[in-house]
Every structure is written in C-alpha cells, then in structure tokens.
C-alpha cells in the first residue's frame, strides 16, 4: 500500500529561495556537450522539461580543462561555455524552475587524451585509480596520475573561484561543489587515495583542507545560502577511507561553520548498497544546521517516509528524472513511471535524452 506522499509536495526554504516541492534532480553526467565542451541547445530542452523539480542540479561541469575526466562533459571556464549555459538557465527560468550548477574537478579519474597537452591527470598522490572513464571508443581505464605539487593548489582554488563567478554570469541560481564520488576533493579527503606528507595530507584536518578551502573560494562570489556541497562517505571510483565516520563528522562540522545552504549526501554506495559503509547519516544531518538532501536509490514511498519522519529536508532522484521529465506530477498522481534506457545514458543526441514521454503523451 502506498504511503501518504503529501510531504513530497510541501514548499521548502533554501536560503532565500523557495522551492515548491521537496524533489531535487540529482546531477547526472550525460556526455552530450558540443565542441569546446559547451552545452548544446538540446541540453536547454532537457533541463527545461524537468523544471517542475523543486531544484535542478546540473550535470558536473569542469572548472578547468585539467578538471575534465570524461568525453563531452560541459565546462564552466570559457566565455563560450558561459554563453551556452545561459541558454540552459534561461530555458529553466522560463519554465518556472530553479537550477544550480555542479562544479567539478575529477582529479585522477581522467585520461591523458582529455588533459591539456596530453599530460597526466592530477591527484593528491601518484596512485592510479582502478576505475574507468568514457572516451570516443567507449569506456577505458583511467591514466596514471601525478601528484599535485603544493605550488599548484592556489591555482586550483582560483579555478573554483572563477567557475563560481562564471556560474553567476551564466544565470544559475546557485552552485553545488562536487566533493563526492572519488573525484579530486574526495580523493584528498580519503586516506586510501591521499598519501601526502604536507599540509594537505596525513591528519583528517589536513586531508579535509582542500575541500574547505574550495568552499571558501566560491563563498567569495556567492551568498552562503546559494551554495551546497555533495559528499559520499562510501568507496566510489576506487577512493575509500579507513574511518569515514570520523572524517565526515569533521568535514560536516567545518562546513556547518561556513553556513552552507545544504549538504547533498550519497547514503551508501552510489547506485548500490545503502549500508556499504558504517556511517551515521542521521548524526551527520543533525550536526549540520543547513538543509540536508538525501540521495541513493530512493523510491516515492521511501522519500515520503524520510521527509515525514524528519530524517531529511529534500530527496534527490537521478535515473527517475532521466526517464520521467514530469516526475513531480507522476509522484503526485502515483502514476506509472517510464523505465530509463541505460544504453543512452552516456553520449548521443535526443534519443534517451529529450524524447521520454510525459503523462499527457503516453500511449
């Protein structure tokens, strides 16, 4: 029997933004950017179709050429990229929606063919991740990284600040820092990938330093209520920590002190076991005064229960939004859901992107 889903459709105040419902479209890499890593016109259509979500969070957008890890992902560091993202934000706003951009640096999860001058990807340490990237020929092993030199870190922080400034120029309503899923900031935080012996390695405080400094960099540009961050305590992309509870308790405490608008928490393994790591997510939520977005395999009923019980403020959905642009209305009516076509998740054109039918188009 279906639970009372009324909690899904209550408005929520996020900073100075009022969200009309508690559904968040999670950031979803779709690998459809055009030459120059700019968002295409069909991307404006794609996000505009989904504007009924309480909040849209864009696909990860690299803050620099070095920050790219997959083929045809959009950037937010060039004037052309800013101009094309403006078409997306205009489409979302015209449809009555709200959209944040996700700022992304992949770190070691990349390939030399995607890096400036064919160079090695960068990470906290010269440790190759046992994971894949997406190239012209399909999925391939990531390349051997090099360790970032201490002298390079200020440049990374400037890239975050510049990307935040560009996001404002592109018309976004706010931004989310991608500090999850085994990418650069997550690599620095977790001791499985960070073997440094300087101010950015060793202790939990040191390993968390880059994440906190990147957050402070974007807060130079944006009001704190318009900034969120995504975290993933579990192992992702071969990036794990020996004591995630202690690590993320510290990280959340530091982020709370900065007054961020929200934490977007991937609870358990991404698209996998929700109990993949022994972490007290409710405890983390309780130590943060901003909003909490729960993510990972939530159904309509699970989300309604979590919201009704007060365990979360908002719930993010990924694949359900891929296949159901009108997910909010489908949840409201408890209507059948379209099934996502996994074959079209990464790369391609309109098929599996903007051609999923709405309820009024269903046969």
Q: Language-model features: where?
A:
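Flavin-dependent oxidoreductase catalytic cores
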Residues: 1-363
């Amino acid at each position: 029997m279906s639970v009372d889903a009324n909690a899904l459709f209550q408005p929520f105040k996020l900073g100075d933004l009022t969200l009309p419902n508690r559904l968040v479209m999670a950031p979803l890499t779709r690998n459809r950017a055009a030459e120059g890593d700019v968002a295409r016109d069909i991307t404006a259509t794609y996000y505009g179709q989904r504007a009924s979500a309480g909040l849209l969070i864009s696909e990860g957008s690299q803050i620099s050429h070095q920050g790219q890890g997959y083929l045809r992902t959009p950037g937010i560091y060039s004037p052309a990229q800013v101009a094309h993202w403006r078409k997306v934000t205009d489409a979302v706003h015209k449809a009555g929606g709200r959209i944040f951009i996700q700022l992304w640096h992949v770190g070691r999860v990349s390939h030399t063919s995607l890096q400036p001058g064919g160079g090695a990807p960068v990470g906290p340490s010269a440790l190759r991740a046992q994971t894949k990237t997406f190239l012209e020929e399909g999925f391939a092993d990531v390349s051997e990284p090099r360790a970032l030199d201490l002298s390079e870190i200020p440049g990374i922080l400037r890239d975050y600040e510049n990307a935040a400034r560009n996001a404002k120029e592109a018309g976004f309503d706010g931004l989310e820092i991608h500090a999850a899923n085994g990418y650069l900031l997550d690599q620095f935080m977790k001791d499985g990938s960070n073997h440094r012996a300087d101010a950015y390695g060793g202790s939990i405080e040191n390993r968390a330093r880059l994440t906190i400094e990147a957050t402070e960099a974007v807060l130079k540009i944006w009001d704190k209520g318009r900034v969120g961050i995504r975290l993933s305590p579990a192992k992702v992309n071969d990036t794990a920590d020996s004591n995630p509870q202690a690590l993320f308790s510290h990280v959340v405490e530091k982020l709370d002190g900065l007054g961020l608008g929200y934490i977007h928490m991937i609870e358990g393994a991404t698209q996998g076991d929700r109990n993949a790591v022994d972490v007290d997510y409710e405890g983390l939520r309780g130590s943060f005064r901003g909003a909490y977005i729960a993510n990972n395999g939530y159904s309509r009923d699970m989300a309604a229960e979590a919201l009704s019980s007060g365990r979360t403020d908002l719930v993010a959905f990924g694949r359900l939004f891929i296949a159901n642009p009108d997910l909010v209305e489908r949840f409201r009516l408890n209507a059948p859901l379209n099934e996502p076509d996994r074959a079209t998740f990464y790369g391609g054109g309109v098929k599996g992107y903007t051609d999923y039918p709405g309820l009024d188009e269903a046969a």
